[in-house]
Amino acid sequence: MKRAVMALSGGMDSTALLVRLLADGYKVDCLSYRYGQKHSVELERAQLNIEYLETQNINVTHRIIDLTSAMSIFESALIEGGEEIPEGHYEAEQMKATVVPNRNAIFASILYGYALSVASREDCQVDIALGVHSGDHEIYPDCRPEFYNAVEHAFALGNWDSEKVGFRLPYLEGDKVTILKDALNATDILGLNFDLIFANTNTSYNPDSEGRSSGKSGADIERILAFNKLGLADPVEYQTSWDEVLSNALEVEKVHKDNEYRERLTQEQYYVTRESGTERAFTGMYWDEKRSGNYYCICCNHLLFTSQMKFDSGCGWPSFHTEHPRAGIKHVQDNSHGMQRIEVRCSKCDAHLGHIFNDGPRAYGGQRYCINSASIDFKEREE
């Protein structure tokens, strides 16, 4: 049987990782850490899921490691006695206050030592599994790929038999949506109750005395948006209704993204994509572009068109007869300016792209995507 040891925080990501490992046939040992965190309710939630798994005849060894005396001397808003937990978007600058210095290096070091011990005792290979993901990279340096590459190298140099253990980080390039999709699949394979398992988790950095999530910390916002992206209501208990926490999360996301767009885009790009404006004909940089390559959304880098789909319509705006198969461009009825038209918007970030008309090449279905140059970014294909 395959063997794994992992850090089970009691949050969404590590819980999803646990059910994935079990679905993949691993025998799993879990370590949870008590380090003086304000949201220690996560440890109770972790134990609830271990107990639920036992009722389903799935046995997982679970140990809680007490690091309070060591880590309570660290400075972080996440630790008892630290400053108040900031609210807002999970990528906002103020969320750096929730970084606990060197936390993941400490956790990984203990896991590595435990994995070596299991490998020696059971004479087997052991995977060290962690649920870190791309959404953590912006704020938490110890969740980035280069950190784990360096840590694994250092630990291998400092231990005998290091060839028997290795890191397994399946979500490193994914996000919370990726994680939830994976958990849905894993719980289905195992015949487990997805809602019950994720009701028994805590992601909030500032739950109330009853363990209910605030819905306002950066971690909450990211989780709420992930559930909503999949058309799901989060089964965890919040201090207010799901509709209220979702409305707040969507507004926080909108404001954060708008601030980002204002900083990054030119005035015309912002006007076109975020205010549904239109550039003047024959003024955009791509209306007569002839090079081979791909066209991406200027706001979110989502692939929209390829140069093979572009044609010269003579209208003064970039014209395409087909969208990329994975573009999923949204079509929206537009009755502005006394006209009836079909607006096209990016499916990923809702950027206004232009309009679609029925005067395109018949050989390709007769449609013409009339796109603002300001809404797209062209990347030339290397020969």
Across the structure, where does each feature detected by a protein language model lie?
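Local cysteine-cluster metal-coordination motifs and their immediate loop/turn environment
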Residues: S109, T203-L225, Y295-L304, D350-A351, ...
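A short Gly-Trp-Pro
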Residues: E253-E383
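Short linear capping/connector segments at secondary-structure termini
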Residues: G131-S134, S204, T278
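Accessory C-terminal segments flanking Radical SAM cores
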Residues: D182, A186-K229, D234
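Short, surface-exposed acidic
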Residues: N59-T61, L190-T201, Q267-T273
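ATP-dependent adenylation/nucleotidyltransferase module used to activate substrates
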Residues: M1-F194, D220
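Iron-sulfur (Fe-S) cluster-binding segments and ferredoxin-like electron-carrier domains
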Residues: R212-V245, L304-S313, G354-H355, A374-E382
